[in-house]
Amino acid sequence: RECVEVRGIEKMGRGAVDSNLVFIDGLVVPDADRIGAEGEGFRMLLDTLNPERILIAAEAIGIGRRALDKAVNYANERKVFGRLIGQNQSIQHPLAESWMALEAANLMVWRAAKLYDEDQPCGAEANAAKFLAADAAYEACDRAVRTHGGFGYAKEYHVERYLREIMIPRIAPVSRELIMCYIAEKVLGLPRSY
């Protein structure tokens, strides 16, 4: 344990899950305890990222759906000038678009999960699922806040929390930009850009 130091990270969200910096210095790993060949650990780690991307995508869908449900419920209850705000197309259309985007992204999540479960290559699908789900969910969360107007900024309605929580699927375990690089190179056959 003297070779390992753990430091907590304060975050804007994800209070239920610890995040830490782990420093390992001077730790000797006997050959018998090593997994795989020396220097191949990072390559082995990359193979574990597909299920993580699928999981993060499914999480994003759940957060987006919850935010959308909150927005729809609020739009069906809130009256302004004697009229439900949900009667206005400027409220309806963004929420309808979010529902469609979330459902489309969810199909890619299920496609990626099916391929993974069948032990098939799923890098493109896992990356696409994560990209599409994170974007669709972010839009749904942003629209939920805006549907609530000033109350969207208040903790009482919880939509501000969903907007904070959806940031992780947008940036982890891989950024949107790196996903686009992966798709461009591995799926479309374009030259490597980095």
Predicted features, each with a name:
Residues 45, 71, 112, 163-167:
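Short alpha-helical scaffolding segments that buttress acidic/His motifs in well-ordered protein cores
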Residues 61, 65-68, 95-105, 109, ...:
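Alpha-helical transition-metal enzyme core signature, strongest for iron centers
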Residues 1-73, 83, 175-179, 185-194:
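FAD-binding core of flavoproteins
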Residues 38-41, 108, 162:
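N-terminal alpha-helical segment
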Residues 72-86, 99-132, 145-153:
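C-terminal helix-coil-helix/basic helical segment that borders enzyme active sites and/or dimer interfaces
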Residues 92-93, 126:
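Short alpha-helical transmembrane interface motifs in multi-pass membrane proteins
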Residues 120, 127-194:
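Alpha-helix capping/hinge segments and adjacent helical runs
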